[in-house]
Structure formats: structure tokens, C-alpha cells
């Protein structure tokens, strides 16, 4: 009887360890894929943005990461569609940021 209980515990422990190992592998794979995508994104940004524009986007990413990510994704889509024919300067990036910010900004009004 005690041996049966011990056997059940051992099987349960092995099962839990196996599940934990699978979860860990899945998480590591997801992290690796995210890092690959980020590296590809940065490589494309290097190709289509001037150094000043990249610096600006990096600063925007510190303050408004969701806005910076949205701009990056839009720029990648345009690049992949062949709609970006020349490097984007800091001035062009400012205009793009302003346009996207205007579309996504939520307006708050305080009534007295």
C-alpha cells in the first residue's frame, strides 16, 4: 500500500517535471522568436531611417513605446510593399509621428 502511494507520487512528480520542462522550452522558443523579429525590425529600420531619425525613434520609444512600435510596424509594411523609395529623414519622421499621434491620441476633457 505504501509502495503504491510512493509510486503514484513519483509518477505525479515526473509528470509535473515534464510539463514544467515543456513550458520552459516553449517560453524560450517564444523569446528567441521575439528576439529574431526585433533584430529583423531593427535591420529594416537601419535601412530606411537616417541616423537622426533612428535616434528620434529611440527617444520616442522611451517615452511612448506603443507609439514607436506602431510607427515601426507601419514603416515596415510600407517598406515591404515597396512604397518607401528613399531614406526617411528626421523631418519626415516627425511628420509621421505627428500624424499617427493625432489619429491615436485620446482627448481628455475635464468639466467643472
From Swiss-Prot:
Q: Which GO terms describe its molecular function?
A: DNA binding
Q: Which UniProt keywords apply?
A: DNA-binding
Specify the species. Thermococcus sibiricus (strain DSM 12597 / MM 739)
Is Iron-sulfur included in the keywords of this UniProt record?
no
Q: Does the keyword Nuclease apply?
A: no
Q: Which family does it belong to?
A: Belongs to the PDCD5 family.
Q: Name one GO cellular component term.
A: cytosol
Instruction: From the Swiss-Prot or TrEMBL record, give the protein name.
Output: DNA-binding protein TSIB_0525
InterPro entries associated with the record: DNA_bind_arc (IPR022889), PDCD5-like (IPR002836), PDCD5-like_sf (IPR036883)
Signal peptide interval = none
Amino acid at each position: 500500500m505504501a509502495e503504491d502511494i510512493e509510486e503514484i507520487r513519483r509518477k505525479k512528480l515526473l509528470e509535473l517535471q515534464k510539463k514544467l520542462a515543456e513550458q520552459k522550452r516553449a517560453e524560450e522558443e517564444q523569446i528567441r522568436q521575439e528576439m529574431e523579429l526585433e533584430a529583423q525590425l531593427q535591420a529594416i529600420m537601419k535601412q530606411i531611417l537616417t541616423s537622426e531619425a533612428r535616434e528620434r525613434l529611440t527617444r520616442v520609444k522611451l517615452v511612448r513605446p506603443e507609439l514607436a512600435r506602431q510607427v515601426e510596424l507601419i514603416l515596415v509594411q510600407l517598406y515591404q510593399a515597396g512604397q518607401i523609395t528613399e531614406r526617411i529623414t528626421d523631418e519626415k519622421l516627425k511628420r509621421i509621428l505627428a500624424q499617427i499621434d493625432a489619429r491615436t491620441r485620446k482627448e481628455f476633457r475635464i468639466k467643472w
